[in-house]
């Protein structure tokens, strides 16, 4: 039995919502199917890492390195801290910024690493 796919699509497009509902019910009865969503157990593990991709990062100073003056300048520029606070941060390390967008966090990391610091994004 040959059919014209486009003609069938056009005919279905002309049906009202009630007519479509009746058609679906009739097809369910004829073919013995239900509208339950099929769940695949095997693919869930592979999809998890993509779904959990982080969008916000904390910029963490690990070590100021040898050129502390340049690192202190970058810390001040990034955080807006005063000279003393930025110096203390460069000596003890810690979180410089929390909840930063990925591209902005990577930019901050690059600036600090160019100044000689060791930085992590968490």
Curated annotation (Swiss-Prot):
GO MF annotations, alphabetized: mRNA binding; structural constituent of ribosome
Disulfide bonds, paired cysteine numbers: none
GO CC annotations, alphabetized: cytosolic large ribosomal subunit
Biological process (GO), any one: translation
CDD domains: Ribosomal_L7_L12
Sorted UniProt keywords: Ribonucleoprotein, Ribosomal protein
Quaternary structure, from the entry: Homodimer. Part of the ribosomal stalk of the 50S ribosomal subunit. Forms a multimeric L10(L12)X complex, where L10 forms an elongated spine to which 2 to 4 L12 dimers bind in a sequential fashion. Binds GTP-bound translation factors.
PANTHER family: 39S RIBOSOMAL PROTEIN L12, LARGE RIBOSOMAL SUBUNIT PROTEIN BL12M
Family according to the record: Belongs to the bacterial ribosomal protein bL12 family.
Purpose of the protein: Forms part of the ribosomal stalk which helps the ribosome interact with GTP-bound translation factors. Is thus essential for accurate translation.
Protein name, UniProt field: Large ribosomal subunit protein bL12
Gene field: rplL
């Amino acid at each position: 039995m040959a059919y014209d796919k486009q003609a069938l699509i056009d005919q279905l497009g002309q049906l009202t919502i009630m007519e479509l509902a009746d058609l679906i019910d009739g097809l369910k009865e004829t073919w013995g199917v239900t509208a339950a969503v099929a769940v695949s157990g095997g693919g869930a593990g592979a999809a998890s890492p993509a779904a959990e991709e982080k969008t916000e990062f904390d910029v963490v100073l690990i070590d100021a390195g040898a050129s502390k003056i340049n690192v202190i300048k970058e810390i001040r520029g990034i955080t807006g801290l005063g000279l003393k606070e930025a110096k203390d941060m460069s000596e003890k390390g810690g979180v410089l910024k929390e909840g930063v967008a990925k591209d902005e966090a990577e930019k901050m990391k690059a600036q600090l690493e160019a100044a000689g610091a060791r930085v992590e994004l968490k």
